[in-house]
UniProtKB/Swiss-Prot annotation:
<comment type="subunit">
    <text>Homodimer.</text>
</comment>
<feature type="binding site">
    <location>
        <begin position="101"/>
        <end position="104"/>
    </location>
    <ligand>
        <name>substrate</name>
    </ligand>
</feature>
<comment type="similarity">
    <text>Belongs to the ribose 5-phosphate isomerase family.</text>
</comment>
<dbReference type="GO" id="GO:0005829">
    <property type="term" value="C:cytosol"/>
</dbReference>
<comment type="pathway">
    <text>Carbohydrate degradation; pentose phosphate pathway; D-ribose 5-phosphate from D-ribulose 5-phosphate (non-oxidative stage): step 1/1.</text>
</comment>
<feature type="active site" description="Proton acceptor">
    <location>
        <position position="110"/>
    </location>
</feature>
<feature type="binding site">
    <location>
        <begin position="31"/>
        <end position="34"/>
    </location>
    <ligand>
        <name>substrate</name>
    </ligand>
</feature>
<dbReference type="InterPro" id="IPR004788">
    <property type="entry name" value="Ribose5P_isomerase_type_A"/>
</dbReference>
<feature type="binding site">
    <location>
        <begin position="88"/>
        <end position="91"/>
    </location>
    <ligand>
        <name>substrate</name>
    </ligand>
</feature>
<protein>
    <recommendedName>
        <fullName>Ribose-5-phosphate isomerase A</fullName>
        <ecNumber>5.3.1.6</ecNumber>
    </recommendedName>
</protein>
<dbReference type="GO" id="GO:0009052">
    <property type="term" value="P:pentose-phosphate shunt, non-oxidative branch"/>
</dbReference>
<keyword id="KW-0413">Isomerase</keyword>
<comment type="function">
    <text>Catalyzes the reversible conversion of ribose-5-phosphate to ribulose 5-phosphate.</text>
</comment>
<feature type="binding site">
    <location>
        <position position="128"/>
    </location>
    <ligand>
        <name>substrate</name>
    </ligand>
</feature>
<dbReference type="GO" id="GO:0006014">
    <property type="term" value="P:D-ribose metabolic process"/>
</dbReference>
<dbReference type="InterPro" id="IPR037171">
    <property type="entry name" value="NagB/RpiA_transferase-like"/>
</dbReference>
<dbReference type="GO" id="GO:0004751">
    <property type="term" value="F:ribose-5-phosphate isomerase activity"/>
</dbReference>
Length: 230
């Protein structure tokens, strides 16, 4: 799919999601190229419809800067009550609405916002859809002190670990940690793998977002917009 066509689909899905935001909400805003279109659509709603939000929290400085550039005030997650709605993208979405996220490296904050949200909507184009989770590296954020042992253990488990790189150096997250991308495809037993990672010393967070998403807005190449609701 050509990038211009993919961007058109992302914009359509983002505008659909923006139409569902209501004044007075505490809104969570995610990270990524699709979310950038969503933020632009929010700005238009503020200017044209008088949209006024109680608070906004974001999962990246990129989204924060874009929102502030459009006149929105951005709060810290710790300073708000439960988030009413979070709109985010997803790197892959399975038939049951489970997802892989964190391709941009912000998985820890993304998950913290998600678990503090009453409702979660993901906006994607059809290229992100899979029957079973896979087709995209699964990011695992790890502490530097234990990262080498984590890498060896993941390799022994057959999870095909790879270091996330930034040019010729290991990628460093917002929290000063490293990311190990697991290339096992498809993801073996997602719930079992999530439990394994949750109980592995040195793992800060992983990109399996299971039983979290309530709705996915999908832009298809034929121009249709599909709503999938759990």
């Amino acid at each position: 799919m050509a990038k211009t066509e993919q961007d058109r689909l992302k914009k359509e899905a983002a505008e659909k999601a923006a139409s569902m935001v209501k004044s007075g909400m505490i809104l969570g805003v995610g990270t990524g190229s699709t979310v950038a279109f969503f933020i632009d659509a929010l700005g238009k709603r503020k200017d044209n419809d008088g949209l006024k939000l109680k608070a906004i929290v974001t999962t990246s400085n990129r989204s924060k800067n874009q929102l502030e550039g459009l006149g929105f005030k951005v709060s810290e997650l710790a300073d708000v009550d439960q988030v009413d709605l979070t709109v985010d993208g997803s790197d892959r979405v399975a038939d049951n609405l489970d997802g892989i996220k964190g391709g941009g490296g912000a998985l820890t904050l993304e998950k913290n916002v998600a678990i503090n949200s009453k409702k979660i909507i993901w906006i994607v184009d059809e290229s992100k859809l899979v029957h079973r989770l896979g087709g995209f590296p699964l990011p695992v954020e790890v502490l530097p002190i234990s990262c080498e042992q984590n890498f060896k253990r993941f390799k022994q488990e057959g999870l095909k670990p790879q270091w996330r790189m930034d040019s010729d150096k290991r990628y460093i997250t917002h929290y000063g940690n490293y990311i190990i991308d697991l290339a096992a495809d498809p993801v073996p037993a997602p719930h079992g793998l999530a439990d394994y990672l949750d109980h592995t010393v040195g793992v800060v967070e992983h990109g399996l977002f299971l039983d979290m998403c309530d709705e996915v807005i999908i832009a298809h190449s034929d121009g249709t917009i599909e709503d999938k609701i759990k």
